[in-house]
Regions:
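Catalytic machinery of carbohydrate-active enzymes
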Residues: 1-372
Length: 372
């Protein structure tokens, strides 16, 4: 698998891969991590991620070690003035004795801050891609690519610039067996037989501007329950509990409350077992794509869909074009016009996906048999 790599990259054995964003961003590093392992057999990969993003590491079997860090250049103004904190990061990286660093960023981020930290830590090979000039901070700089390129492809273009071969460009994760067992126990404790069909609803996102109204999600999920006869497993973080008001009342006895009951590996196991997932453009969207589970994605106008949408799973991506998109905002001042999507449209999208999979046909057949 190993080909002719630029410079000393072919001899690199201790690699630092930097992705300092959210869970979904880290999930999308999978194809790069896999390609690095395939091209450099026996290499050791440390993932430098944010504390939140590091939660995805158990799903990425190519990661040998995880370093979780809140860095100043990704901060939203919440970190105190503390230069010693950044110097501690440099010293931590220095102790890692890394041969090379691969710095992954989105189209609007710079790799140069991370590159400078790696330079100060004595990492000789430092790869990144940027539109702006960064002096000698990076030892290897990939040419800029179009903004609209999908993030997975953007990541892969970076290492392909150095001659790394990429055999598989698809997103994938590995669900730990322990997480599958825990997910099964959670379902069974709520009267859902493990292995039986269910819908999964993950109705929230970390940003208000990316959250489809919960009452509409509840109405859509309720209708899909009526059509399929399946329960709706509702997932979310512990912080989402305060947002459940009215949701389970609307779902009735078909709603299965797992909000705040799972970590990310267990959420992935629940996504893996679902017949259909309803979600926003958040980490659950990337999980369903990696696991090839059909999903209806309510995609807000905060981002360009070409950069983030599922590429492998069967899906329906619903959004309304608006003059203000993409806004990259956390809070929407315009009443979420990009989410002006009635629940009926969500239901129609879900039923069309189930029909493609033959699920509705199977249910109708069972109903006919019961009437006979």
């Amino acid at each position: 698998m190993k080909g002719a790599l630029a410079g000393s990259w072919g001899e690199a054995r201790r690699l630092l891969v930097v992705r300092l964003d959210n869970i979904g961003d880290v999930v999308m590093t999978g194809p790069v991590l896999r390609a690095l392992k395939e091209n450099l057999p026996g290499s050791h990969i440390t993932l430098l991620a944010s504390p939140g993003g590091s939660k995805a590491a158990p799903l990425l079997p190519w990661v040998d070690e995880v370093l979780a860090w809140r860095v100043l250049w990704q901060d939203l103004g919440r970190l105190s003035f503390d230069p010693a904190r950044e110097l501690e990061l440099v010293e931590t990286l220095r102790r890692g004795s890394y041969d090379a660093a691969v710095i992954l960023t989105s189209f609007k981020q710079t790799p140069h801050a991370a590159g400078y930290a790696c330079y100060l830590a004595g990492i000789p090979l430092r790869l990144g891609g940027s539109k702006e000039w960064g002096g000698g901070v990076l030892s290897d700089e990939a040419p800029s690519v179009p903004d609209e390129l999908h993030q997975v492809q953007r990541n892969l273009r970076l290492i392909e610039h150095l001659g790394f071969r990429v055999e598989d460009r698809a997103l994938s994760i590995r669900v730990p067996e322990e997480a599958r067992g825990t997910a099964a126990q959670l379902l069974e404790a709520r009267s859902v037989t493990p292995g039986s069909p269910y819908l999964l609803l993950n109705p929230w996102a970390s940003a208000q501007a990316r959250t489809y109204p919960t009452d509409r999600f509840a109405r859509a999920a309720g209708r899909l329950c009526e059509e399929t006869g399946w329960p709706v497993v509702v997932t979310g973080t512990g912080k989402d509990r305060e947002r459940t008001s009215g949701l389970f009342e609307a779902l009735g006895d078909r709603g299965v409350d797992l909000v705040g009951a799972t970590g990310l590996p267990e959420l992935a196991a629940l996504v893996e077992g679902a017949r259909l997932v309803l979600t926003n453009n958040t980490s659950t969207m990337h999980l369903l794509d990696a696991l090839r589970v059909p999903g209806v994605v309510l995609f807000s106008g905060t981002e360009l869909e070409e950069q983030w949408r599922p590429r492998s799973a069967r899906h329906r991506l619903l959004r309304r074009e608006t003059w203000c998109s993409p806004c990259y905002a956390f809070e929407c001042p315009y009443n979420l016009e990009c989410f002006d999507i009635p629940p009926e449209e969500v239901v129609e999208a879900g039923l069309s996906l189930l029909a493609e999979a033959g699920d509705r046909a199977a249910k109708n057949s069972r109903q006919e048999e019961s009437r006979a």
